[in-house]
Amino acid sequence: MINKHNSVLHNQFWQSYNHRGFMVTKLSDLMSYVSSWARSNSLWPMTFGLACCAVEMMHTAASKYDLDRYGIMFRASPRQADVMIVAGTLTNKMAPALRKVYDQMTEPRYVISMGSCANGGGYYHYSYSVVRGCDRIVPVDIYVPGCPPTAEALLYGILCLQQKINRTATST
């Protein structure tokens, strides 16, 4: 009987926990770990392209970087998306539309702010018609700097979001 329990604890699945330095003792902890792993490896972003940063976002989705291999599939509907990539200058007239789209997204939802204009207003920071950062309208999880940021920078931001989701396990 002791050998039977030892074989369960020495299973390859449980060895992966030992390498990380912890062992799951409750089923809810295991389910939380598995759901955050699955959620981080199947992101469905919705594009909210407002300016030149949107071109770099499309470049990231093209064949050279191929976001499909990371489990990232772009969606056109906010009800199917769990990540919104805000790329470009957010004007005061566009801010209510951004909030409306964000509210239509499924929980848990994440926002990536891409480019200097989305992060803090950018070149048009002092204009009367520009919101000085999309974080004044929606909560932002990852900021990608640059004017416009490169495709590699956006890819790095998406990978950082995946790591953040893995770190913050949410109960379902």
Curated annotation (Swiss-Prot):
Organismal lineage: Bacteria, Pseudomonadati, Pseudomonadota, Alphaproteobacteria, Rickettsiales
Protein's name according to its UniProt entry: NADH-quinone oxidoreductase subunit B
Record organism: Ehrlichia ruminantium (strain Gardel)
UniProt main location, coarse: membrane
Membrane association type: Peripheral membrane protein
Alphabetized SUPFAM superfamilies for the sequence: HydA/Nqo6-like (SSF56770)
Domain of life, source organism: Bacteria
Record EC number: 7.1.1.-
Matches recorded under Pfam families: Oxidored_q6 (PF01058)
